[in-house]
Amino acid sequence: MLVFKKSALGALLCCFTLPVLAELPTITVLATGGTIAGGGISETKSNYVAGQFGVDKLVEAVPQLKDIAKIKGEQIVNIGSQDMNDQVWLKLANAINQGCSGSDGFVITHGTDTMEETAYFLNLTVKCDKPVVMVGSMRPATAMSADGPFNLYNAVVVASDKNSAGRGVLVAMNDAVLDARDVTKTSTTAVTDL
């Protein structure tokens, strides 16, 4: 009888789990580089080079993402955000506008130096009504206390939420969600800089 109960429970869980998995939203992660993809020579040193890891490595660093969304990754560029320019902005806007029908939301990994400019530009040029959420970090991916994985997880949660649709471009960092027009970098070193 105990075997039957375990089998019945397993079948029941299977039947209820599969439909939930099938309903996970598809989120496209568009990677541009920045500190969130940065790498240093040591976990304890503060020097690093931005844009050292691609979108696949960023997503792999947060295995819990598979529980909240189906992730598609696209590497737009892999640069420090001080090198961001209008050509990259247009490429991002086009990727979102053209990919709108195939995704339930978008997350853009980005450096914080020019995140506010990119967010504002995309807020004006993206015509997709799906959630668009920008995310970055103040510590590189190789740092002992990297904030990127937590920020990326939260950005995917926000992009997966249907209530985020139609709100323009959002920025999710440090347990906060901001509108593109309200984002300002206030410190070059503080983790809570936006």
Which sequence ranges carry the predicted segments?
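Bacterial N-terminal signal peptides that target proteins for export
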Residues: 1-11
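Active-site histidine-anchored catalytic micro-motif
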Residues: 23-194
